[in-house]
Structures are given as C-alpha cells and as structure tokens.
C-alpha cells in the first residue's frame, strides 16, 4: 500500500487539497462557544405572592409543593428558600435522566399541590436550566445629564427602554429575549380631602366606588336591526388622569366630581428596587442568546446597534457590562495562540534534532492538514469549538507531532543504513505503523473511561476525549499518507541523508553520546533505581492525603459580585446610598460597577432574588490583583461600618460556573430542630455565638433577621364600637397608599389607581388616628395593639424539612476539624441536630471516581499491551513506570501549591496514556532485535541508541506543545494549567524512566531466560 502511494504524488496531493477545502468549509460552519452545549439537570419553581411573609410562603405554599416534588424520580437534591413575597425551589437531578419527562412530571405535581391554594394566588413559574440562561452581556441605559435628572425624565427613560430599546434588541435574529430590570412605573394617587368628605357625611370608600362604577365594559354584546346585526359598545372607561378627575358621584343630595373632593396626581410608584451604574440610576437589560447563534455574530450586531443608539439618542448613555463574548474571545484566542506556539516549538525541536531544513517542512505540512481534517470530523460529529475541545486539540498536537517524528526518524535511519530511498520510505513507514497504531489505541483507551464519568463532568469532557481521539487518528492518517510521499520527493536527488553543515554545529544530537555510559552505570548500581521505585510506591499515598481536593482549579477573574445583606429594615434609598458610599472608597481601582439594590424585575434566574435590604454590586477592575484587593478592602470596610451586615463575594457568573456549580460553599451545616419545628431566634443566636467562640478563625455570619410590626385587634372593642375588620384594613391601606381601586391598561403594563392619604411614619400609624363610625370617631389605638417580632428573612428547607444553613468557608483538613467542632456543640444542645453538605463532599466523590477511572484506564492499557506483545509479563514492565510518573506528578503539584482537582486528575490520566508510548516503542524494538539474534544486553543497548533521539524529540514536542498553558491569565489557561503541570511533570519523569528504568526492568526479568 505504501509503495503505491510514493509513486502517485499527484493523487496524494489532490486528496490533501480536497481535505483542506472540506475542512475549511466545516470550520466556517462550526459553532463557537465557551463550553460544550449540554443539558443541565436542574429545574426551578418560582412562587410569587406579594402579600405574604416568608413564614406564610414557607408554611402555606412551599411545604405543599415540597411534599409533592420530593417524589419526582431521579431527584438528587432539593432546596426550598422562602422570603417575603415569594419563594424558590431548586431541584437537581441525576445527569442522564430524561429531562423532558421530568419537566412534565414536575408540572403535574405542581398542579396537584396548588389545587388547594387560594384562587387569587398565581401559578408557580417552572423553568428548566439551560446554557443560554447566562446572558451574553448586560446593557445599562442611563441619562447623560445627571444634574437635571428628575422623576419625570426617569419615568420617560424607563418607558422608552421598555417600548423601544428592548424591542429593537429582540428583533436581532441572534437574540432569544431581553430580560429587563430597573424599570420605573407610574401610578395615579388620589388624596381625599377628608374635611370635605366628613362635612357631607361620606368617606373615601365613596370615591373608590364611584371610580369603579365609571369604568364599565359591556363585553361582547350585539343587537339586531332588520337584516343586520351590530356590536354594542358602552363608552364609559377610565384611561387617563383627567378621566379620573371628571368622574361624577352623588353625595348628600348633590353631585360632585372627584376633583372637587380629592387631589389626583400622577407619580412614580414606590420603589422596590433600583439599579445604578457608576453612580447613575439606570435600566439594565440582560441579552439572552439563542442556542444556535454564534457569539461573534451576536457581538457584531449588538455593536452596530449600540452605535446606532448612541447616534439616534444622544441624551442617553449606553454601557455594555459582563460581556461573555469578551471572555469567550479572550479564552478562545489564547487557546489558538497556545496551539500555534506549540506547533512552532515542535518544529524548532525537529529543526535541531533532524539537522536540516526539509524535515521540519514535512511536519509543517502534516500538522495543518491533520488539524483541518480534525475540524472536518468535528463538524461530522457535531462537536463545537470551545475551550474543552481546543484543549483536546492542544493535547493531541504533541502526540500528532510524535507520529511524524517517529516516521521521519525511522525512514532516515533505514536510508542511512544503505537501503534505497523509496524502500526506506515504504518499509520505514510500514515498520512503525503497527506500534504507532498501538500508541493511538492506548491513548484513546485512556480517554474512554472519562466518557463514562457520572454527571456533567463526564458529558463535558466527552469533547476533550473525542478531540484527542480525532486528532490522533487524523495525525496517524496524515503521517502515513503524506510523509513517505513527500519525503521521497524532497530527498530523491540526494544519495543519502546529509545534515546541514550550519545546523550540525549547534545540534543537540551530541547529547546522546553519553547514553551508553549512563545506562551501564545504572546496570551496575541497580539498587538506586529500585530504591527510587520503592520510595515512589510508599510516598504516593502520603502525597495523595496531603494534597487539597477541589472540583476545579482556581480561575483568575477581573470582575466580581459583592453580595450584601444589611440585616436592617432600611428603605431602598438608604440601601443605594450605602452602596455608593462603598464604591466611593475605590476611585482608581474600579473601572465600572453596577449596583442592584432591593428587589429586581428579571424574569429568568440568572440573577438571584433579593429583598429590600439586600444589594448585589457588580465590579469590574483592571486586573486580577485589583479585584482581589477590592474584595478584601470592601469586606473590611463593610465590617467596620455596618457590623450587622452579612456579605460575601463571588466571581461574576458564567456558563462554566453554572455547569459545575462552583459557587457551592465548601461546607454548609444544616442546623435543624430535633422536633422538626422552627428554630427560636434567641436559641439560634445563642448557638451561633457558641460556634463563634469555638471557631474564632472561621467567619460565621450573623443570621439574616426580618423584624416586623405585628398589629393585634381587640375583638371585644371592635364589637363594642361597631367597627369591622374591613374598615381597619381599608384605613391602614389608605394610610400606606396601598388601597388600589383599579388598574388602567397601558399596553404591556397596567397603571394602578390608588387612594391614600399620604404615607405615615410607623409611630403615627396608630397614635392620633381615628376611624369614622355611625357613633362618631373612634381612636385606632384603643382597637389595635402593636408589637414587634422577628423571624428569619429566608427560610430554607429540603428533603428533611426546615433547617438553618450555616456556611463555613473552610477547606481541606480544616473543614473536617470545623465539622467535628460544630457537631459537638450543636448536639450538646438537645434542641438541635446538624447535617452537612457542600463542595467538600462532592469534590471527594469526584476524586474517588477519577481514581477509579485511572485504575480502569490502566487495566485497559494492560489488555491492549498484552494483546500487542502476546505476553503477560511485558505489559507489567511498561506499566511499572507509571508508579514513578504518578509520584512525580503528585510531588510537583504539592510543591507548586496546586490542588488535586478535576483537571489535574485528567492530566494524570492522559499522562499515563502518553508516557508509555516511548516505552512501547523501546520494548518493541528490543523484541525485534532479539528475534534477529541480538543478545539481551546488546539488544537493550542498541534499542536505546536507536530510539533515544526519537524518545527525546517526542517528549520535548509534547512538553513544549502544552508549555504555553503554564502562563495563566484567562479562564482557558487557568483551567488547563494543572492539567499541563501534571502532564509536563509526568512526561519529564516518564522520559527518564523510559530511557533508564524500563531497560533495567526488562533486563532483570529476562536475564535468566536469555541464552
């Protein structure tokens, strides 16, 4: 087969061109995303009930939903959180379960649970988590003229954003929807003239009745007139402020208009939440990308639209923040840059080792064609370009060059021994094809168990496994197809291989001269090598225990989310003022910030729900160091000025965090009452104080308390003074501007018409207030009694019922010690019990699973090697080197301060598949030489000399191909850093072991049988 190829160079060239054309066409159509598009096994149920407290939401709504939803199949965990005005149920399912069936089942169970609710309650909103839930970016719209920013202009800007900006954004084909928050809405406030009403013997209820009666709609009525039928319409509706003012009513025998008895004015509704960007009140829009849209196209269209907005609306300021496309571009560009640098380093290595200019040119031809063929396979197998698949390409690049080096080196050796060039090209390629195929299979075998990892991690790294497999197969095809043909064409006019005179002077090939002497030294002092082997066996377990276990490596970021719960009943204006006060402390450190205070209006769950006393501040700094400094100093400033506040910081959300739930706290202690009842505030406060005393080095936040005023009526006095409960409720609603008469439709929203007498202070709500009855005016303070209570602001519950979640930010051995201390203190109190969850446990489960993957991978390698060598002994010789290699990897991780995480473990697994390739070639060569009659020791020395240059070259090219990932700075490089560190340290140790330890082990085993 290979002989026919060398004689048909034009046919081979045409095949290459066809592959490149198809591959380039496939690249243009491949989707580009940050991570692979996979299903996320999460469903959220959002409950809304504006008039209910957190306790009522939990007891009356979430408890019934929870009892139904815990029965859903494949449920992994359920967390219910109740707060004033609503609640959220987050369900996580086993990966691989039928998401469509589960979604239908959840809807049916929600309908079953809500059948007993009050008819006025809204049906809960159910949403499936998706990779597109993370906005591509946020757009802040604010007024440029801050000095003349008034309530009217802000209302106009809000209406303009809702009516115009969002619709123009949603018209883009790449945009699925625009989620918006920070909107301001108007209302009509009717302030009755109570003196006039009392003078004519009426109250404010007469005004509300008149307005409701004036807003009449007959509905669908028609009347017949001869042969025709006409619709009947009744023109009596209230749609403007003037309509309300001109409503007629009859009181005390006279007719009045509303404007005669009350003042009607249009004003802004009471703020429940607010957003400011760099000190300006703004409207924020989250742009959600369609799942099949390309990020680059979306960014280009948005940039064009932003330029048009700034030109058409000069009074408005448009700002793009939290740009996921920037993260994608930066990560992808760095990955591509690292890929190119890796290829360049590989060519430099070949340039110096092969000592001429033509051999690197062969590799330069092979690498691009193999990469383009790989992208063609990507397109066929529906694999996107993302940081995972690109990292697989980079891993495969080093091994891709290995095949080319081995083929070129073997052809050159046979040619130098006197074989004709064509025969050297044909038989040199044919000789190494079988061991190269075995190397590809062993490497692919390493990745097969990664595909079967449970959960999202297995699905995510399917792309990496497939990318490496595709790259290796493509490289093998191109190596045997291209190199013999073009090698023959490049050198056919030369009698033999002649190194370039200039390069041979600076060649590193002279380093091989001392190989025989070093190997002979190890043969004489075999105890040194066996001592290293024994020490590695003993110390692997010690290093494994000492290394911290994490799910993911620490990813650098230049932005953050600062979460604050003030733990005080402050108004939204004070909340915003405090946020601005914090940001004023960092004038030169922060590039931009967006403060979201109070409740937000987003429909999707990309931004967590917040209450009136909570704030989320997004901060973008110039560098990783600046953001670390900001987080540290901001926390200190908040602690000094507002000691009751609870605060935390986290990286700004991206799809990678969403997939791996990296925001999960290290340890969460779920403290609950032994009898299942609600924890008493005083008991919980005392318990947390004891924990702070016992764990001074651990930050234990204050409980988030919700203080409220409780009004208790006196039924006996209500009956005595002939006052109904509805009268008291109506008065309180009017006093707090909460008595809604009707809602006027304004298209996509409705404007409430409210009757009120102006908001009152809490101290004036009862004292000095009266209710008019038929018997006269009754002081409200003799009918009501006021008390103040407190309860948890957020009430958490799960499968085991209600609990208090205590977050402990501790890692490693400190986590185990902290849990022992907490358990001892909590269980000493007969009222409480505790259980634990958090990333501390999930990380260890994942590491155990990866260790199982490593064992399975080594077993697969053993089976493949045993089949290849037809021996049960030689696989042990090759695989024994993994002991020293794994010890070297763990030692380097420990010295560099890295943890044992998903990426470092995958690097270790991949290293096991790559590092034995050199040993496979060496053992195969030793076997061939022994079959030709060489003695054992001579065969070992000869095989070492023949393969030394190829082994060093392949190791160096693999190491240098992934060396660019040792430079951190973006998410892609940070993610690949521990993988690269593990792979490089393993390859360095593996090269030493392949060159010196494997020949020694081969000699020790076969010296007795050698004749």
What is the predicted function of each stretch?
Residues 179-183, 191, 260-263, 274-348, ...:
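Juxtamembrane "pre-transmembrane" interface segments
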Residues 1-32, 432, 500-553, 669, ...:
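Signature of alpha-helical transmembrane segments and their immediate interfacial
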Residues 56-133, 195-216, 237, 574-663, ...:
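Solvent-exposed, membrane-proximal periplasmic/extracellular interface segments of envelope transport
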Residues 79-84, 158-283, 287-288, 675, ...:
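Beta-strand-rich non-transmembrane domains
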Residues 312, 328, 332-336, 353-355, ...:
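Cytosolic juxtamembrane regions of multi-pass inner-membrane proteins
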Residues 2-9, 291, 296, 329-386, ...:
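Interfacial segments of transmembrane alpha-helices in multi-pass membrane proteins
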Residues 10, 17-53, 111-120, 379, ...:
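Transmembrane helices with small-residue packing motifs
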Residues 324, 641-1009:
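C-terminal transmembrane helical bundles of large multi-pass transporters
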């Amino acid at each position: 087969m290979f002989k026919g190829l060398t004689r048909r160079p034009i046919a081979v060239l045409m095949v290459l061109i066809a592959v490149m054309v198809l591959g380039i066409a496939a690249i243009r159509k491949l989707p580009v995303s940050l991570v692979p598009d996979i299903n996320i096994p999460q469903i959220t149920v959002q409950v809304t009930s504006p008039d209910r407290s957190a306790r009522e939401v939990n007891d009356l709504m979430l408890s019934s939903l929870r009892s139904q939803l815990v029965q859903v199949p494949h449920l992994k965990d359920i967390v219910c959180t109740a707060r004033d005005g609503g609640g959220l149920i987050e369900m996580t399912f086993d990966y691989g379960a039928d998401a469509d069936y589960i979604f239908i089942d959840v809807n049916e169970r929600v309908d079953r649970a809500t059948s007993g609710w009050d008819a006025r309650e809204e049906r809960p909103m159910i949403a499936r988590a998706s990779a597109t839930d993370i906005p591509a970016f946020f757009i802040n719209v604010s007024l440029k003229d801050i000095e003349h920013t008034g309530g009217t202009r802000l209302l106009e800007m809000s209406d303009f954003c809702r009516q115009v900006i969002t619709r123009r954004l949603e018209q883009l084909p790449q945009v699925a929807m625009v989620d918006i928050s920070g909107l301001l809405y108007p209302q009509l406030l009717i302030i009755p003239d109570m003196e006039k009403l009392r003078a004519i013997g009426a109250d404010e209820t007469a005004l509300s009745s008149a307005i409701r009666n004036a807003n009449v709609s007959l509905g669908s009525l028609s009347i017949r007139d001869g042969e025709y039928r006409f619709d009947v319409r009744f023109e009596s509706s209230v749609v403007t402020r003037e309509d309300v003012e001109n409503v007629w009513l009859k009181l005390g025998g006279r007719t009045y208009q509303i404007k005669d008895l009350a003042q009607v004015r249009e004003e802004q509704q009471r703020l429940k939440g607010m957003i400011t960007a760099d000190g300006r009140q703004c409207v924020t829009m989250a742009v959600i990308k369609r799942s099949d849209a390309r990020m680059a196209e979306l960014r280009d269209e948005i940039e064009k639209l932003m330029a048009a907005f700034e030109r058409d609306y000069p009074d408005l300021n448009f700002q793009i923040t939290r740009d996921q496309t920037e993260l994608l571009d930066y990560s992808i560009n760095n990955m591509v840059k690292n890929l190119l640098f890796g290829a360049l380093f590989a060519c430099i290595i070949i340039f110096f080792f092969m000592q001429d200019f033509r051999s690197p040119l062969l590799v330069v031809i092979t690498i691009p064609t193999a990469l383009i063929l790989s992208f063609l396979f990507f397109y066929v197998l529906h694999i996107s370009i993302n940081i995972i698949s690109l990292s697989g390409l980079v891993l495969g690049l080093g091994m891709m060059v290995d095949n080319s080096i081995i083929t070129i080196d073997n052809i050159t050796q046979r040619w130098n021994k006197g074989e004709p060039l064509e025969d050297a090209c044909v038989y040199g390629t044919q000789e190494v094809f079988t061991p190269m195929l075995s190397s590809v299979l062993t490497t692919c075998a390493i990745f097969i168990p990664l595909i079967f990892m449970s959960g999202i991690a297995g699905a995510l790294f399917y792309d990496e496994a497939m990318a490496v497999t595709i790259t290796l197969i493509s490289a093998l095809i191109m190596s045997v197809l291209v190199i013999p043909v073009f090698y023959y064409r490049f050198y056919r006019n030369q009698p033999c291989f002649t190194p370039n005179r200039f390069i041979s002077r600076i060649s590193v090939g002279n380093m091989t001269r001392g190989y025989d002497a070093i190997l002979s030294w190890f043969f004489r002092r075999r105890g040194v090598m066996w001592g290293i082997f024994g020490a590695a066996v003993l110390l692997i377990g010690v290093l494994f225990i000492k290394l911290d276990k994490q799910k993911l490596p620490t990813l650098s970021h230049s932005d953050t989310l600062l979460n604050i719960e003030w733990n005080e009943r402050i108004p939204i204006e004070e909340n915003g003022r405090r946020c601005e006060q914090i940001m004023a402390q960092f004038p030169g450190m922060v590039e931009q910030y967006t403060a979201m205070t109070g409740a937000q209006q987003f429909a999707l769950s990309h931004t967590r729900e917040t209450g009136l006393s909570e704030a989320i501040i997004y901060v973008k700094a110039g560098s990783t160091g600046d953001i670390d400094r900001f987080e540290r100093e901001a926390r200190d400033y908040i602690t000094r000025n507002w000691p009751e506040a609870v605060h935390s910081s986290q990286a700004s959300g991206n799809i990678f965090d969403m997939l791996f739930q990296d925001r999960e706290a290290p340890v969460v202690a779920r403290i609950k009452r032994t009898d299942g009842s609600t924890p008493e505030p005083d008991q919980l406060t005392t318990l947390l104080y004891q924990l702070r005393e016992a764990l001074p080095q651990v930050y234990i936040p204050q409980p988030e308390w919700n203080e409220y005023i409780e009004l208790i009526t006196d039924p006996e006095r209500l009956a005595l003074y002939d006052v109904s409960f509805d009268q008291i409720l109506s008065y309180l609603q009017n006093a707090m501007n909460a008595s809604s008469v009707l809602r006027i439709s304004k298209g996509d929203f409705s404007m409430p018409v409210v009757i009120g007498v102006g908001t009152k202070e809490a101290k004036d709500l009862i004292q000095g207030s009266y209710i008019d009855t038929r018997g006269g005016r009754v002081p409200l303070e003799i009918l009501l009694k006021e008390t103040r209570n407190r309860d948890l602001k957020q009430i958490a519950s799960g499968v085991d019922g209600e609990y208090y979640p205590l977050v402990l930010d501790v890692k490693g051995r400190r986590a185990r010690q902290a849990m022992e201390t907490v358990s001892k203190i909590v269980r000493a109190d007969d009222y409480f019990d505790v259980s634990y969850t958090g990333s501390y446990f999930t990380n260890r489960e994942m590491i155990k699973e990866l260790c199982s993957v490593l064992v399975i991978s080594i077993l697969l390698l053993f089976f493949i090697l045993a089949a290849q060598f037809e021996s049960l002994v030689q696989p042990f010789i090759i695989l024994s080197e993994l002991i020293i290699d794994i010890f070297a990897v763990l030692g380097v991780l420990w010295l560099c301060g890295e943890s044992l995480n998903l990426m470092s473990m995958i690097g270790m697994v991949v290293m096991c598949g790559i590092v034995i390739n050199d040993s496979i070639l060496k053992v195969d060569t030793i076997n061939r030489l022994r079959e030709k009659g060489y003695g054992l020791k001579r065969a070992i020395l000869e095989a070492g000399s023949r393969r030394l240059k190829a082994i060093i070259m392949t190791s160096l090219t693999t190491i240098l191909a992934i060396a660019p990932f040792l430079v951190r700075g973006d998410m892609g490089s940070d993610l690949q850093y521990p993988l690269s560190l593990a792979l490089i340290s393993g390859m360095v140790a593996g090269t030493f072991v392949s060159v010196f330890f494997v020949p020694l082990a081969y000699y020790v085993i076969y010296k007795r049988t050698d004749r």
